[in-house]
């Protein structure tokens, strides 16, 4: 099992001019990129796992590898999600400011070496999104912190 937790100290921001955000998804894991979240209309982007890149750069031999796959040849999948502006979906980990609403990023892994396809289940638990990826002997649980929009949109 692989567990990825996004720390509450580092919040991911959404473009303040728009209510949509485009997510670049890498179909093969683990892949560490320096540009994961970007706005669908402007040049804003969020290096969500830039700290993981620096930590893993010296430990590339320790990372699990998949034979026959080359991450540099994989294409990114682009998806756009709309914000949910309901006040009851406000994230508890965010600071009390003008932020309200939640974008739940529904990440979908397309194929892994063509052997299996993952399924996505979204379970709302304590105002977080719990993403359960199910594949052949592969379970990945991600608790992803919310992305909030500005209250005065």
Swiss-Prot record:
PANTHER family: UPF0768 PROTEIN YBL029C-A. Belongs to the UPF0768 family. This is UPF0768 protein PB2B2.18. It comes from Schizosaccharomyces pombe (strain 972 / ATCC 24843) (Fission yeast). The lineage of its organism: Eukaryota, Fungi, Dikarya, Ascomycota, Taphrinomycotina.
């Amino acid at each position: 099992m692989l567990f990825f937790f996004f720390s509450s100290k580092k919040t991911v921001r959404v473009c303040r001019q728009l209510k949509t955000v485009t997510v670049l998804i890498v179909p093969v894991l683990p892949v560490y990129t320096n540009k994961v979240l970007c706005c669908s209309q402007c040049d804003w982007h969020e290096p969500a796992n830039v700290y993981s890149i620096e930590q893993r750069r010296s430990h590339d031999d320790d990372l699990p590898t998949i034979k026959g796959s080359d991450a540099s040849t994989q294409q990114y999948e682009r998806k756009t999600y709309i914000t949910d502006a309901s006040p009851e979906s406000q994230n508890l980990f965010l600071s009390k400011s003008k932020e309200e609403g939640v974008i739940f990023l529904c990440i979908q892994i397309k194929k892994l070496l063509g052997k299996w396809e993952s399924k996505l289940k979204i379970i709302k638990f304590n105002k977080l999104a719990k993403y359960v990826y199910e594949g052949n002997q592969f379970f990945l649980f991600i608790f992803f912190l919310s992305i909030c929009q500005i209250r005065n949109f």
